[in-house]
Amino acid sequence: MNINLLTDAPKHNLALMKISAYHKAMDDNVYLNWVGMFDKTYASWLYDFTMKGIASVEGGPAVDNSILPPEIESMKPDYTLYNLDFSLGYTFRPCYRGCLFCKVPKMNHPDKEHHSIWEFHDPKFNKICLLNNNTFFDPRWKETFEEIWDARLAVREHGFDLRLIDEERADALRKTRFEGDIHYAWDRMEDETKILAGLKIVPQGRVYVLVGYDTTEEEDLYRCQKIIDLKHNPYIMPFNQSKREKRFKRFIDSFMWRKYRNIKEAWKDYKV
């Protein structure tokens, strides 16, 4: 059979990588984002604006909450589909925060179990990307770190929850080799006490700052200043993509504020 896989994912798509592995195991020919006639076409869509209804089987966050059949979900990803040089997968899917601005609660994936990295890691790689939505909610999070240390892997990740940070978790982060920045987040002002306590003990990293949701400009400036004072770098996440939010993001990304005594003074002078 000739199988075509379609997606609007800009980098990689784990579901399609597993579908590819499944069909290649049956000696099918697999193509990615080709145009033509095929025996079967799968599509996984991330964005609402993408054209739908052009594949035999469609899924993904922009379509529905459907999941892969067990026989496909259990496959190791086909890393040749995107010519990746790192492993990709989940050791723990859930995040129990239920934040209204986040898509994770809406997806509501039924898999709540811990998984070993060896369910998806290819030992030929020395890097691994964890797609976990909240690693430290996993009661067995230590096992994940121990497997990574034993395999001497460099880690890419989607962020660690500062509200769950204690000395033990912070020490695990310090012992881990990361590729690029470690990522954290400060979305809500009501979490300030726990966020600041976490930022004081974790390794230096990049902190996602949600703006335009339920915070004021004054609170956005305040959060960025606190993050900088604790030797981390803020990274603005515009919620509504408004002109003001995008301008504030450009301001923080420009690092021109480093020339000033504080963020507030720099923002007053920012003209772009």
Per-range role (PLM):
Residues 211-215, 235-272:
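Flexible glycine/acidic-rich beta-alpha junction loops that bind and position SAM and/or redox cofactors
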Residues 1-4, 85, 98, 127:
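Residues that mark the start of a beta-strand
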Residues 42-46, 103-199, 204-213, 233-238:
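Core AdoMet radical
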Residues 56-81:
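Ser/Thr/Gly-rich flexible loops in soluble cytosolic domains mediating phosphotransfer, phosphorylation
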Residues 15, 84-119:
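Canonical Radical SAM [4Fe-4S] cluster-binding loop centered on the CxxxCxxC motif
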Residues 24, 149, 228-229:
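Anion (oxyanion) recognition and catalysis
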Residues 1-55:
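A short, structured N-terminal alpha-helical element that caps or precedes a catalytic domain
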Residues 214-230:
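Catalytic cores of alpha/beta
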